[in-house]
Amino acid sequence: MILILTQCFPSRIGGIENLMFNLCYYLGKNNKVIVFADQHDFIRDSIFDNKYKNNFLVRRFSGIKFFRKRNKIKELEEIISLNKVKAIICDSWKSFEIPSKKLKFKNIPSICLIHGNEIIIKNKNHHKRIKNTLKNVDKIVSNSEYTK
C-alpha cells in the first residue's frame, strides 16, 4: 500500500493537481493507493473520486486548516497501524510537516516533492520549519534544477 498526502488534487485544476493525479493513477495500476486530499467542492470531488475508485481510494478532508491537517494525521495513523505501508508520498513539505514528527520512528520510506515557489524563504521561522520537515524525509524530488 502507498499513501499519498496532498493539498492539491483533482477535481481542482492545476499543474500540481495533474501531477498528483497521474502519480496516483499509475502507481495504482500495481499497488493499492490511498490519497489523503483536501476537499474543495463536495460534488465535483465526489464525482471525480467515484470515477477513479477502481484505481485508487481518495479520503477527503474539509474544514478549517488546523483541524483538517490533524484529521488527516489521525486517519493516517490508523491506516498505518492496520496495514503494511510501502511508502508515503507528499506533494509538498507542508503536507509532510505534521506527519513527519509522528511517523519518524515507523520505518516507512517517505518521498516529498518540492516546487520552486514553496521553498522561497519568508523568514527564519519559515526556513526552520522547512529544514526540520525535510530532514525527516527519505527522498526529496525537486521539479527543476533551480529548486535543487
Could you tell me what each predicted segment is?
Residues 7-13, 20, 25-68:
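N-terminal strand-loop element at the rim of the active site
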Residues 137-148:
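A short, active-site helix/loop in glycosyltransferases that binds the activated sugar's phosphate group
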Residues 90-96:
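Short His-centered aromatic/hydrophobic patch
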Residues 12, 67, 96-97, 110-125, ...:
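A short, histidine- and acid-enriched strand-loop-helix "catalytic/donor-clamping" loop
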